[in-house]
């Protein structure tokens, strides 16, 4: 039977306490006003959460994806907007630089990303394209020593916060044997021609920073290429695979939070003179949910 280590249990308890005492009290108002609390982000950085799966040489905690999943699950119990901010900050923001960046790029970006002093977005999804690389329309062409980028992206998390430093953009950089050559390029926020559009009015996760992006002749140095030219498709698929693990942890946490809320409601709701929790129908439903296998344990 799988069990957490003592260190992992301590991490879970620490993040759960942080979620209940710091995150939860501000969640309703943050969601209502569509505002990501930068104070909460800073405190997550102080706790080392953004650096969990990274080596200490870059400012990380020397942990792994299990540690990250534990933290995201604990946050997801009370606030999925905060949980996805951490997940995207790690999996989509810092991880591409760590996996595919040059040593110079790692030294430039990772210390601030892993400390929560900066965030980064991952510009993959487009109005008509996502993991289908063949449908990508954003282009980047070399002009002297610069990449010139044109196109648009949508639903890009952490792309417009006050501390967002850059977005990694997937773009068509050529053609190989009749197939689009996809590359990834670092585009700093504030680059002329790069616009972070107004945030979305979503049906949920409203405190998560999510924007469409547009590029109209945005020019960045050729050295901003992340990984080898043409390796973008392979690279972003590996990044998405890791991210899906973290999303599963977030979803598990959200389900646990919903179940706990349902139990609390059943105990407090009075019907025909007694608590709803005393009714067998409610008991059976809640017990079935409690005893069902968790995706985390599979």
Describe the predicted segments one by one.
Residues 8, 19, 71, 102, ...:
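Buried hydrophobic positions in well-ordered alpha/beta secondary-structure cores of metabolic enzymes
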Residues 138-141:
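A structural signal for short hydrophobic beta-strand segments in well-ordered beta-sheet cores
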Residues 83-104, 130-133:
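N-terminal glycine-rich flavin-associated loop
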Residues 290-298:
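Single conserved hydrophobic/aromatic residue that forms the stacking wall/gate
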Residues 2-11, 73, 77, 194-289:
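Glycine-rich beta->alpha junctions and the first turn(s) of the following alpha-helix
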Residues 128-131, 157-162, 174-176, 202-209:
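Short Gly/Pro-enriched turn/cap motifs at secondary-structure boundaries
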Residues 1-86, 107-108, 112-115, 119:
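Amphipathic, small/basic residue-rich leader segments at the start of a protein or domain
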Residues 150-195:
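A short core secondary-structure module
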């Amino acid at each position: 039977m799988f069990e957490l280590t003592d260190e992992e249990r301590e991490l879970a308890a620490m993040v759960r306490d942080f979620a209940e005492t710091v995150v939860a009290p501000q969640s309703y108002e943050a969601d209502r006003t569509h505002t990501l609390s930068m104070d909460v982000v800073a405190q997550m950085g102080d706790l080392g959460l953004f650096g969990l799966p990274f080596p200490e040489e870059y400012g990380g905690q020397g942990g792994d994806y299990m540690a990250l999943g534990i933290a995201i699950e604990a946050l997801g119990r009370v606030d999925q907007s905060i949980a996805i901010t951490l997940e995207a900050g790690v999996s989509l923001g810092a991880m591409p630089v760590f996996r595919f960046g040059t040593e110079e790029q790692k030294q430039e970006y990772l210390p601030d990303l892993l400390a929560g002093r900066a965030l980064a977005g991952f510009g993959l999804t487009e109005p008509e394209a996502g993991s289908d690389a063949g449908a990508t329309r954003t282009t980047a062409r070399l002009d002297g020593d610069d990449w010139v980028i044109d196109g648009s992206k949508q639903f890009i998390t952490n792309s417009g916060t006050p501390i967002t430093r850059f977005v990694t953009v997937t773009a068509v950089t050529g053609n190989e044997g009749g197939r689009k050559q996809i590359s990834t390029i670092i585009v700093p926020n504030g680059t002329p021609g790069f616009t972070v559009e107004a945030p979305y009015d979503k049906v949920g996760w409203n405190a998560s920073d999510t924007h469409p992006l547009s590029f109209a002749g945005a020019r960045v140095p050729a050295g901003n290429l992340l990984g080898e030219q043409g390796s973008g498709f392979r690279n972003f698929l590996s990044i998405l695979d890791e991210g899906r693990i973290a999303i599963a942890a977030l979803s598990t946490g959200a389900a646990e939070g919903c179940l706990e809320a349902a139990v609390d409601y059943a105990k407090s709701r009075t019907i025909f003179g007694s608590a709803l929790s005393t009714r067998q129908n409610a008991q059976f439903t809640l017990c079935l949910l409690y005893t069902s296998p968790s995706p985390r344990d599979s």
